[in-house]
């Protein structure tokens, strides 16, 4: 589908519609149904009524994503730069993590700027940009997202970072499955992981499944660490019995180190400890099995599965 290419300034002159109550949800819904013009009207109406707010910037990031996914890289880069500039201006008066909208907006702006650079053959510039952003925002909630995008460009073919609290069996290939208790896509991988384990664990594959705490339990209810830890175990027993063994390894450091801001994130490490696959998001059985089979078949760890 061809996306509408509109500069940011034109968002001020599109015919207004009543300002929506949940601009992010409304804009996402409009894009999901192909109603690009409607999404732009919603953004315009919200800005006219509320001004440029963190919620507006997050909603606008969905327009930016749409341009990127349609390979309209010039527009995506311009929009992302605008979101970045507005976000960093707000940071002069407030911390990033005071509420959720600004981190999501800024994280998207960084992700899309790096993505447009890489997509246009400017990979080294993308890596440098992400390294700079990692240094700038290293003490904030968006660091894992920045690292995810950096690792997408750099991790495959490199030694696997160590895992906090987990020892990878030496000389064995390993499948690392980063999951979250709230994650529906993680649960959708259960049948796939069950088949992968049944076939390849007897052939020497190690299966590791770290997670982390998020500060809440079912329904988004705030939870103390001990309560959430117990809830994680409850989810494991309910959904992942036979796939994820107890005790579950819980560590925020692992998620930051591997940039696992997307769950699931799937990492495949060969016998020599080299990352051969780094995949934020769910995978099909066929794709995952093919990657694992190639690593298993290589006895010396020189397989080049997915290596960039």
Where are these regions (language model features)?
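Thiol/disulfide oxidoreductase modules built on the thioredoxin-like
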Residues: 239-293
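Flexible helix-coil transition and linker loops at the boundaries of alpha-helical arrays
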Residues: 47-56, 86-103
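Structural microenvironment flanking redox-active thiols in thiol-disulfide oxidoreductases
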Residues: 188-239, 248-256
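N-proximal helix/coil linker or "cap" segments that precede and/or mark the start of modular domains
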Residues: 118-164, 226
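Short active-site neighborhood of thiol/selenol oxidoreductases, capturing the structured segment around
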Residues: 166-187, 193, 207-210
């Amino acid at each position: 589908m061809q996306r509408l290419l509109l500069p940011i300034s034109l968002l001020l002159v599109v015919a207004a519609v009543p300002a929506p109550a949940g601009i992010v949800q409304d804009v996402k819904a409009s894009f999901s149904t192909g109603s690009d013009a409607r999404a732009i009207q919603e953004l315009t109406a919200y800005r006219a009524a509320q001004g440029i707010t963190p919620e507006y910037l997050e909603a606008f990031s969905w327009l930016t994503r749409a341009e990127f996914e349609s390979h309209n890289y010039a527009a995506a880069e311009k929009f992302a730069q605008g979101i970045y500039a507005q976000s960093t201006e707000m940071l002069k008066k407030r911390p990033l993590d005071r509420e959720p909208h600004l981190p999501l907006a800024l994280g998207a702006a960084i992700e899309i700027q790096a993505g447009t650079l890489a997509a246009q053959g400017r990979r080294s510039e993308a890596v440098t940009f992400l390294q700079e952003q990692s240094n700038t925002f290293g003490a904030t909630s968006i660091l894992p997202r920045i690292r995810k995008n950096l690792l997408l460009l750099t991790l495959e073919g490199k030694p696997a970072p160590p895992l906090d609290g987990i020892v990878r069996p030496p000389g064995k290939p390993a499948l690392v499955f980063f999951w979250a208790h709230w994650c529906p896509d993680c649960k959708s991988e259960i049948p796939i992981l069950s088949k992968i384990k049944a076939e390849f664990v007897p052939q020497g594959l190690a299966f590791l499944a770290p997670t982390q705490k998020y500060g809440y339990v079912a329904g988004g209810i705030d939870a103390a660490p001990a309560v959430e830890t117990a809830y994680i175990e409850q989810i494991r027993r309910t959904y992942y019995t036979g796939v994820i063994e107890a005790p579950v390894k819980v560590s925020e450091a692992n998620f930051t180190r591997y940039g696992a801001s997307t769950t699931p994130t799937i990492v495949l490490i060969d016998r020599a400890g080299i990352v051969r696959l780094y995949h934020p998001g769910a995978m099909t059985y066929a794709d995952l099995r093919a990657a694992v089979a190639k690593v298993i078949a290589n006895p010396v760890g020189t397989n080049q599965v997915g290596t960039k």
